Amino acid sequence: MAAPLVLVLVVAVTVRAALFRSSLAEFISERVEVVSPLSSWKRVVEGLSLLDLGVSPYSGAVFHETPLIIYLFHFLIDYAELVFMITDALTAIALYFAIQDFNKVVFKKQKLLLELDQYAPDVAELIRTPMEMRYIPLKVALFYLLNPYTILSCVAKSTCAINNTLIAFFILTTIKGSAFLSAIFLALATYQSLYPLTLFVPGLLYLLQRQYIPVKMKSKAFWIFSWEYAMMYVGSLVVIICLSFFLLSSWDFIPAVYGFILSVPDLTPNIGLFWYFFAEMFEHFSLFFVCVFQINVFFYTIPLAIKLKEHPIFFMFIQIAVIAIFKSYPTVGDVALYMAFFPVWNHLYRFLRNIFVLTCIIIVCSLLFPVLWHLWIYAGSANSNFFYAITLTFNVGQILLISDYFYAFLRREYYLTHGLYLTAKDGTEAMLVLK
């Protein structure tokens, strides 16, 4: 399987290198769908200029990246294009090996449940085979590397790509069962963009599964392991933040990065849900509604943990999608990360209800973004309502798509234990309805 992966990597790097050398690179780097005030390469360059002059990069209201990122590019500024191509390649490789190991765990668990007669007798067609799962890791790498969203993000040199790499390595180390490395990469991802904090719960649930520790409030082993993992995570985060202070000799980065993410002061249009509402809102209402909007990312973690505690990797997939939809400054690079997981759930396609319509909605919206932006900003024949309407449609399409996957997953799990052909009490055919 190594040769096909290398081929995919070569094709992906070639496409990116060609686009970097084309006239499209400058155009892509300015697209509001691809970069945000947090991830814009131009803002990184401005921060580097201030740093070279001996001025704090956070002294203005332009740079909002983390100190480790600015010091990374302080030394690698001349190789920025190569750094972003390597970053994408590392993300794909990490996802490839993560899903390869995950499939082994899934098949082993499925085999055990079959031996214990935990499945209904008429669900043979729902059982996954090694041949069916063989090419899934390669498809995941393919979906990530050749996704137009990922390519655009790389060519624009959006720092979202680095965040995706950290999350991918968090997933890999979690599936490998390394609690220490998992905590470190989760801390790095949280340090980079704050929202990956919500991935702590699915990561912990998976590691508990690997240790055969039951998720029970009365279990001493559960609390001991949870405390150890939490301490490794918090300790890593504290070390990273202290290192940032050591580099800058200042705490200015905390309000400039995390305060900026949470308070949403820059209302530059993007593909998110925040900017239009707060541009139209009176200032004295904004704090309340910022809290309401921000809580969406964190609110679903507990109910999802309760419902999907036996399936932490699917929980992780849903949570990454929730972050991509509800974060304050999303870009298409965030969307590309959870889309890479679609091949992992290819066994759910038969249960998806609206996959064709929702796919069409997302594709059409992606094509209309630059059109409506041009009509609004350059032609003057449209206004912000047009652009926000397509943004809202895009996000509703994502929400419905993820909801469809969630429904399909629960439906398949129900069929596995209760049988594929359900009957009502009177013997007639029954239909499964999710409420």
From Swiss-Prot:
Changing L237A: No effect on function in GPI-anchor attachment to protein. It comes from the Eukaryota. Residues 2-3, 100-136, 206-222, 307-311, 346-354, 407-435 are cytoplasmic. Changing T150A: No effect on function in GPI-anchor attachment to protein. GO terms for cellular component: endoplasmic reticulum membrane; GPI-anchor transamidase complex; membrane; plasma membrane. Changing I167A: No effect on function in GPI-anchor attachment to protein. Changing N383K: In NEDBSS; decreases GPI anchored protein biosynthesis. The chain crosses the membrane at residues 4-22, 79-99, 137-158, 159-178, 179-194, 195-205, 223-244, 287-306, 312-331, 332-345, 355-372, 385-406. A cardiolipin binds at K216, M217, K309. GO terms for biological process: attachment of GPI anchor to protein; GPI anchor biosynthetic process; GPI anchored protein biosynthesis; regulation of receptor signaling pathway via JAK-STAT. Changing Y144A: No effect on function in GPI-anchor attachment to protein. Pathway: Glycolipid biosynthesis; glycosylphosphatidylinositol-anchor biosynthesis. Changing S153A: No effect on function in GPI-anchor attachment to protein. Residues 23-78, 245-286, 373-384 are lumenal. Its main location: endoplasmic reticulum. One of its GO terms (molecular function) is GPI anchor binding. It is a multi-pass membrane protein. Keywords: Disease variant, Endoplasmic reticulum, Epilepsy, GPI-anchor biosynthesis, Intellectual disability, Membrane, Transmembrane, Transmembrane helix. A 2-acyl-6-[6-phosphoethanolamine-alpha-D-mannosyl-(1->2)-6-phosphoethanolamine-alpha-D-mannosyl-(1->6)-2-phosphoethanolamine-alpha-D-mannosyl-(1->4)-alpha-D-glucosaminyl]-1-(1-radyl,2-acyl-sn-glycero-3-phospho)-1D-myo-inositol binds at N383, N385. Belongs to the PIGU family. It is linked to Neurodevelopmental disorder with brain anomalies, seizures, and scoliosis: An autosomal recessive disorder characterized by global developmental delay, severe-to-profound intellectual disability, muscular hypotonia, seizures, brain anomalies, including thin corpus callosum and cerebellar atrophy, scoliosis, and mild facial dysmorphism. This is GPI-anchor transamidase component PIGU. It comes from Homo sapiens. The gene is PIGU.
